[in-house]
Amino acid sequence: MKRHFVRIDLTVPGVGTLINIADLVEVDAQTCTVNRMLELDPNETITGAYIHGRCVGRINEPQAAVPHPDSYADFPDIEVTRLDPEEYEALWTEAAAKFPEI
């Protein structure tokens, strides 16, 4: 099971930028599922978390299947930054301190 740790900045015209930090599990070359995800506000403060089908705090629930990070170049409003697993875990630890129920 190959995993991808990514920061996704989605720009929504007239609204702003949505920031998600995701732990994705590769299904195939085009598709992943979301294992865990964090949502950040524009000040990069963690506002919510998603794990095991559960949302805590302020976060949008992810779709069952999401595009593979390698395909994000096809989406003009999405910027993706790959993270090391350690970087992701540090952010998840910060979220767990804020939301102990995760």
Predicted feature locations:
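Broad, structure-driven detector of short, well-ordered beta-strand segments within folded domains
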Residues: 17-28, 38
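Short, compact, well-ordered microdomains
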Residues: 63-102
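Intrinsically disordered, low-complexity segments enriched in small/polar residues
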Residues: 2-3, 48, 70, 86
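Acidic, aromatic-enriched beta-alpha/helix-loop junctions
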Residues: 28-74
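Short secondary-structure boundary micro-motifs
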Residues: 8-10, 21-23, 57, 64-66
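Short, extreme N-terminal segment that most often corresponds to the first beta-strand
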Residues: 1-20
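Generic preference for hydrophobic/aromatic residues in regular secondary structure cores
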Residues: 6, 22-23, 34, 80-82
